[in-house]
Curated annotation (Swiss-Prot):
Native source organism of the sequence: Bombina maxima (Giant fire-bellied toad)
Free-text tissue specificity from the UniProt record: Expressed by the skin glands.
Protein name: Maximins 4/H3 type 1
GO BP field: defense response to bacterium; defense response to fungus; killing of cells of another organism
Post-translational modification Isoleucine amide, affected residues: I143
UniProt superkingdom: Eukaryota
Predominant location category: secreted
Family, similarity comment: Belongs to the bombinin family.
Subcellular location: Secreted
Functional description taken from the UniProt entry: Maximin-4 shows antibacterial activity against both Gram-positive and Gram-negative bacteria. It also shows antimicrobial activity against the fungus C.albicans, but not against A.flavus nor P.uticale. It has little hemolytic activity. It does not possess a significant cytotoxicity against tumor cell lines. It does not possess a significant anti-HIV activity. Maximin-H3 shows antibacterial activity against both Gram-positive and Gram-negative bacteria. It also shows antimicrobial activity against the fungus C.albicans. Shows strong hemolytic activity.
Signal peptide: 1-18
Amino acid sequence: MNFKYIIAVSFFIASAYARSEEKDVQSLSQRDVLEEESLREIRGIGGVLLSAGKAALKGLAKVLAEKYANGKRTAEDHEVMKRLEAVMRDLDSLDHPEEASERETRGFNQEEIANLFTKKEKRILGPVLGLVGNALGGLIKKIG
């Protein structure tokens, strides 16, 4: 008779273990789905922020370009205007990277392409950071 109880208890334990494993698998799959959804939301928010940042930089560059386009310009103003135009072109090329890369890479070898992109990164980052810094500095002065 003890043997029957041992078999019954073993069967009961095995079925309880199987049910708990099944619940664990279901909860893991639900957790994976939730994580995937949250990652999609984060990517969506990141995309929106990036496009908003690009739009803001384009707007800032256009405003500054219009400011320097009107009236007499010094050599320094002319240089700033050239940089702003280059930044605007580079920002436009971010919207259509395939077309821009096709235009820029026609007739270049790989080393020239690498140098071009390094120069392009410096050309984008330098003026953009300078413009953002100047704009923030002006805002801080107005607030303070």
